[in-house]
Amino acid sequence: MRKGVLKDPEIAELFFKEDPEELFIDLHEIGHGSFGAVYFATNAHTNEVVAIKKMSYSGKQTHEKWQDILKEVRFLQQLKHPNTIEYKGCYLKEHTAWLVMEYCLGSASDLLEVHKKPLQEVEIAAITHGALQGLAYLHFHSLIHRDIKAGNILLTEPGQVKLADFGSASMASPANSFVGTPYWMAPEVILAMDEGQYDGKVDIWSLGITCIELAERKPPLFNMNAMSALYHIAQNDSPTLQSREWTDSFRRFVDYCLHKIPQERPAAAELLRHDFIRRERPPRVLIDLIQRTKDAVRELDNLQYRKMKKILFQETRNGPLNESQEEEEDSEQGSNLNREVDSLGSIHSIPSVSVSTGSRSSSVNSMQEVMDEGSPELVMMQEDEGTVNSSSSMVHKKDHVFVRDEAGHGDPRPEPRPTQSVQSRALHYRNRERFATIKSASLVTRQIHEHEQENELREQMSGYKRMRRQHQKQLIALENKLKAEMDEHRLKLQKEVETHANNSSIELEKLAKKQVATIEKEAKVAAADEKKFQQQILAQQKKDLTTFLESQKKQYKICKEKIKEEMNEDHSTPKKEKQERISKHKENLQHTQAEEEAHLLTQQRLYYDRNCRCFKRKIMTKRHEVEQQNIREELNKKRTQKEMEHAMLIRHDESTRELEYRQLHTLQKLRMDLIRLQHQTELENQLEYNKRRERELHRKHVMELRQQPKNLKAMEMQIKKQFQDTCKVQTKQYKALKNHQLEVTPKNEHKAILKTLKEEQTRKLAILAEQYEQSINEMMASQALRLDEAQEAECQALRLQLQQEMELLNAYQSKIKMQTEAQHERELQKLEQRVSLRRAHLEQKIEEELAALQKERSERIKTLLERQERETETFDMESLRMGFGNLVTLDFPKEDYR
């Protein structure tokens, strides 16, 4: 989606549709930062006073700027707390987002700027209390501010403390981005990319630094280069309060906030119960502080206004002031200004505007314009008011006009209209009571000027932060890529394992089906063989029976014939008796044959049953052998499959191990490359900073050398004036002495006395002239020597400072490199332990599976043999009951398949 084109309904809901240029009027610039400017404005429909932060998302890094805007809007929409800035809405206009928020008087940093001295401890406690309540709310919802400092803690008219500027905030905790303002950054933020993540405890560190800022007018290390400050924070001990005037409770609170180890740092909710926060303080402490600050701002602006008015009137009457008049006027006004400010208890402070682009340090600050309607001499300024305020878009383009003053300073004397140039300078201090503020116009102008002047340093820090974020994105992208590669690798291995398992299952199913088919086939063959065997026995027995019967018939005939012959030979026996004896003999023979036949049939039946039983036992034994062969084949197949599976798992483990080592090497190589690039950039930035400082010092020295003749001329004129005064004194003394001598000496000696006095005067003037020349030469030489010595001392001090900063950078980089190498070593050891443990688990699993398989083999074979043995015993017992003897001799020998 093109930036700013609201095609996505979710994004479109973040912005209002009205035209902000028509909705908001009377815009005045009240702050400036890297993102753009902050304006005071009025809602044309409701007359509500608001603050507007304009953020452009065109130019370089458009996508990044647009994403920052979306993130800040989403973040602000979530906030509903008395100690966070109230969000009014966001509008889009010509590649610029108008972020509208409630208007506040100014920031805690402005208090230091106006009063030019540290705040009182009760005032710091009150401001810290409000900030902690806001932080507790953010941290409860897993939000991190990441840019807590005095410039981002705002104050309202009723004395309410508000957290503002959520451009650096994170909607996720923990986070690991390099964001914030250098001097307030927690160590874990600086080392976030190198050592891991951080949470809301970073805001607690920044709050501790802010307490030092409010107590000492500037954060620790503020006199140091911002980059060097980062290196210092990352590797040195936590800062502490320097002055001994603070209470032990305050000291403990600051030390508690600034624990180096985040886990030892307290949470915001815990700090709210600290003695420093809970102790009693006046309920109006912040309201009184704000009122004193507003009075001081009004007085400062009125002093500036009177200075401009005096210059304006002086120019109107006498023309432009000469140089000496201007210097004298500046000196006078400066002393007046100092007297007025000191009467309010104020001293100067270091500006809190951050040099960091990412910090978005310009808070929603504010200022006040007051208008003296009773000053007739300002009528011509009021006539130009329409020109100045006719267009809000012109206000911040024309010299950053900030105007204010107070009634009661008017001069009723009519004056002629001043020149246009002086009038434009006076426009800065016109009197119109437009809005209340605790920030003076000169402070706003100075901050805007500093923002323009520090662009190079700000761009350097912005580039450094951008590089750190880019490095982090590269690492995250690589980690995601490697994770996807590992997931794909594991999925591939898992599929291979599943395929092997499926194939093994299919093979076992095929084997089982094959074995079932073989058993069925063997059963059919056995049934057929048994039937054939039975038929063979029956056929043989039938044949034997037929032969036996035929033999009996022959024997019967032979016996019958033999008996007949015997009877025929015996003539003594009656015929009837013979017939009876023959019949009886025939019956006996038939009976004997019948018994023999029955015996034969019995023997045949017994033989048939015994042989059938024996054949069945042989079939059973053969079936047992087939079952043993089948189970042996199945178990061998399972063992082969399991061995193949184990070989595959070992191969998978080795390939995974190789991939893990390769990925770790790739990740560590990229990390080291990025660290080297980061260190190279840091070194280049430091060298560039060194050159810039040397150039600035050189320019300063050149300006001093150029200014020296003018200074020497002024000193020479001063010595000359002293010489002239001395000459005048001597001339007066000469005249007085001459008159006295002429009065006390005769007239004829007057000529000689005059000559003597003239010679004495000439001699003394010559000595005086020589002293004058000598004084000039000594002054010239001493000033030149003093300038050379001062410049040389400055050069030496700068070289020493830059050398210390370079040593600090080298120490920081060495520490980071050592920490990274140690981290890599830990990662390698952790990987080795994980790989070793995984291999041990795999080998243990293989052993357990092989043992389980062997146990299954033994149990199944044992179960089979026991079943077969029981079946054989049952068969033999039944055979015994059937009257058959031991059939084992006819059985096949058993084999031990175990």
Swiss-Prot record:
Domain named Protein kinase: residues: 24-277
Basic and acidic residues bias spans: 405-416
Protein keywords: Acetylation, ATP-binding, Cell membrane, Coiled coil, Cytoplasm, DNA damage, DNA repair, Kinase, Lipid droplet, Membrane, Nucleotide-binding, Phosphoprotein, Serine/threonine-protein kinase, Transferase
Entry PTM: Autophosphorylated. Phosphorylation at Ser-324 by ATM following DNA damage is required for activation of the p38/MAPK14 stress-activated MAPK cascade. Phosphorylated at Ser-324 and on Tyr residues during T cell activation. Phosphorylated by LRRK2.
Gene3D superfamilies recorded: Phosphorylase Kinase, domain 1, Transferase(Phosphotransferase) domain 1
Residue segments, region Disordered: 316-372, 405-424, 565-596
Leading EC class: transferase
One Gene Ontology molecular-function label: protein serine/threonine kinase activity
This enzyme's EC code(s): 2.7.11.1
Protein family membership: Belongs to the protein kinase superfamily. STE Ser/Thr protein kinase family. STE20 subfamily.
The protein's name in its UniProt record: Serine/threonine-protein kinase TAO3
Annotated organism of origin: Rattus norvegicus (Rat)
Organismal lineage: Eukaryota, Metazoa, Chordata, Craniata, Vertebrata
